[in-house]
Amino acid sequence: MFATRLVVVLLSFVILTRCQYQYTIGAANTPFQTGLHHLASYNTTPNTMGGGQGIRTVAYFVNWAIYARNHTPQDLPADSLTHVLYSFANVRPESGEVYLTDPWSDTDKHFDGDSWNDPGTNVYGCIKQLFKLKQRNRNFKILLSIGGWTYSSNFANPASTVTGRQTFARTAVQLLEDLGFDGIDIDWEYPQNDAQASDYVQLLQEVRRQLDQAEQKRRSRVHFLLTVACPAGAQNYQKLRIAEMDRYLDFWNLMAYDYAGSWDQIAGHQSNWYADPNNNAATPFSTDAALKSYLGHGVRNNKMIIGVPLYGRAFMGTKGPGSSFNGVGDGSWENGVWDYKSLPKSECQVQNDAKLIASWCYNPSAGTMISYDTPEMVSMKAGLVNQYGFGGGMWWESSADKPFGQQSLIETFLHSCGGQHRLEQQSNCLEYPESKYDNIRNLNC
């Protein structure tokens, strides 16, 4: 009897060590299913922590967060993030000019400690606060994110002409130099045909060219980053010229969420890693399938950043994943969408499916399901980032997380990857001699 138990214990230790999964099971959680056969599914050579470069932790900060959400740059866990994507700048469809969308939030608002009597021309708002975080945390970098779902219809026209692409790149880089960004993130959702996919490649090429020129103006060695938010749905990523795009990109932020929602007829998982062969309706998309496509087009593992939602999508009047539903109900800021910090809802049973790496909470009396990532599932996703050397994690968006020490998903992911010492080490830039703002240009660095 003792020998049998010893074999079981040793076997369990070997399996868990191989998987590098770290998780804790709360009282509200159901027992995990096992899906270890998935671990051999990638036809790639596993790397170690992003190819030896460390992991990237990337969070979107939205410029409207300072209003009803009461979330400011000062709330960001800057010592635990390598990159923040400041969202969103827009594009003028007639010219390609990139411009800020909320001057009050972006550059004008005076936060506590900001003087009204500073001499010269100075930037304030979220931009100044983020720059101060850069000064205190030299591994913390800020990228200007352009586009997003609301503004993406403005890309196609300027991207289709040489002049439009040049204007886009020039004005984006000008904002970078004026405001002290470390790079540009482009979120075009989505090119609709091969012509637009080709235009996208040429747009990235032009932005990369002008970023390279901006780098040469610096006394110290610096590399300005170029990244994209990329789709996880086959109907969108199959249109992209992935291999051609990849040569200009530092990394890809995979939007591994919104796999199911109010637009569907069936309640499903919104951020599952694997598809469910026994319940196809519940998993119309999967992170696994998307990653295989990008890797199959030559993208290195360590350039793929795995998106993690800091929110849940609700379905009313349903029996659960794979069943019909009737409406989505209320939400934190929009119907059917709940901030992670508001989850799980009361009287909901939390379900973790380790076979799919998917989780949800369900209220059987009300027939309400909310698909969201629990700390247990995020820890398992971090385990796969470790196992296969993916580049790190990305979160939409920072205001919705729980505080560190209270089941924060950002903290959970980082801890499961090995902690802060596993972060990629790449210094930010503090040298912007061409900035029109005195408090950016005249910084002693």
Regions found by a protein language model. Name each.
Residues 331-390:
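Hydrophobic, secondary-structure "cap" segments at the distal end of domains
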Residues 63-78, 160-178, 234-245, 287-291, ...:
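Short, acidic/polar
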Residues 147, 184-189:
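Mobile, glycine-rich extracellular loop/lid and propeptide segments
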Residues 84, 144, 186, 207, ...:
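Conserved, mostly hydrophobic/aromatic
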Residues 53-55, 80-82, 138-142, 180-182, ...:
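Short, well-ordered coil/turn segments that N-cap beta-strands
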Residues 21-176, 408-411, 415-444:
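Glycan-recognition patch characteristic of GH18 chitinases/ENGases
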Residues 58-59, 95-121, 189-345:
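Substrate-binding surface in catalytic domains of secreted glycosidases
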Residues 3-19:
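Cleavable N-terminal signal peptides of Sec/SRP-targeted secreted and luminal proteins
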